[in-house]
């Protein structure tokens, strides 16, 4: 199943360009990250990554999933924010600079 977690794993992998560093940033093991990406590929029936000599690159399918995944995760965050605002709960962060 395409899950939020698997999409977040793909985004982290692309951001860090390395399975080990992405796994560390996600606080999961490298084998767990590998299994998550493989499960996403199996679910979609497409190879998302080119894995050559320790380097990774997105395939055309990977680029599409990355783009749509970002949109889905952003839409989910927006929905949560809007529902919280309607329910009277404030969420988010405010940065203030004083000079």
Predicted regions: what they are:
Residues 1-31, 36, 50, 56, ...:
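N-terminal short secondary-structure element
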Residues 7, 43-44, 65-87:
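Alpha-helical linker/hinge and terminal dimerization helices associated
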Residues 17-20, 32, 45, 62, ...:
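Glycine-centered flexibility sites
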Residues 20-21, 60, 67, 74:
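A broad detector of short, well-ordered amphipathic alpha-helices
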Residues 41-58, 63:
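A short LG(V/I)-centered, amphipathic sequence patch enriched
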Residues 47-48, 59, 74-77, 81, ...:
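Short acidic/polar alpha-helix capping motifs at helix-coil junctions
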Residues 54, 84-99:
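Interdomain hinge and pocket-entrance segments immediately C-terminal to HTH DNA-binding domains
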């Amino acid at each position: 199943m395409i899950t939020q977690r698997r999409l977040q794993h793909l985004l982290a992998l692309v951001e860090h360009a390395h399975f080990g560093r992405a796994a560390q940033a996600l606080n999961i093991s490298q084998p767990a990250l590998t299994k998550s990406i493989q499960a996403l590929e199996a679910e979609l029936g497409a190879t998302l990554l080119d894995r050559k000599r320790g380097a990774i690159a997105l395939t055309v399918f990977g680029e599409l999933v990355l783009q749509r995944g970002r949109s889905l995760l952003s839409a989910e965050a927006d929905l949560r924010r809007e529902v919280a605002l309607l329910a009277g709960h404030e969420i988010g962060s405010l940065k203030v600079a004083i000079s």
